[in-house]
């Protein structure tokens, strides 16, 4: 099956979901398969990256050390996600775009291969793709631990949460 066939199938599932013919959990499962088949889109159009850029702009223009400002910031962020989900309308595509399982696995595999080859410098240079900690002083065991911890945390944030919320609330849940 080619990538075009996979995308066409995902679009058909998404259209069927909009017509109410398939349950949302099936759309979420199809979205997971879409991520597995195609991986993440480029950062220029990846919804998480776009959302991050939007919210950075909102924060830059409206930042204040007050509870009301924080509530407004959270409300704007939630509104953007929910609005994008409602506009997209397809649970399959929303979950497929929001999930980052394939990229997460690829990054972990690259670091694992570097560790198995004994190339600590390469493993250290790759670690920031998974985690924000400074890898400079980490030995092989600490690098491996950082990968396991990061994969565990990011699996919840970047795979389980969008799929679960997509299954429960459709596209707005996956992106909101």
Segment roles from a protein language model:
Residues 1-176:
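Short amphipathic, positively biased membrane-proximal segments
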């Amino acid at each position: 099956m080619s990538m075009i066939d996979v995308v066409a199938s995902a679009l058909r599932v998404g259209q069927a979901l909009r017509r109410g013919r398939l349950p949302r959990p099936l759309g979420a499962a199809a979205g997971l398969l879409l991520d597995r088949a195609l991986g993440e889109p480029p950062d220029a159009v990846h919804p998480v990256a776009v959302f991050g850029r939007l919210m950075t702009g909102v924060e830059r223009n409206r930042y204040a050390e007050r509870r009301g400002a924080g509530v407004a910031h959270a409300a704007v962020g939630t509104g953007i996600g929910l609005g994008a989900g409602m506009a997209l309308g397809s649970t399959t595509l929303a979950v497929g775009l929001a999930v980052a399982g394939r990229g997460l696995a690829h990054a972990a595999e690259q670091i694992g291969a570097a560790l198995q080859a004994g190339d600590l410098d390469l493993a250290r240079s790759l670690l920031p793709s998974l985690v924000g900690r400074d890898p400079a002083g980490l030995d092989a065991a600490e690098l491996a631990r950082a990968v396991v911890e990061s994969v565990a945390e990011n699996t919840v944030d970047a795979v389980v949460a969008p799929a679960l919320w997509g299954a429960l609330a459709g596209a707005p849940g996956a992106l909101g």
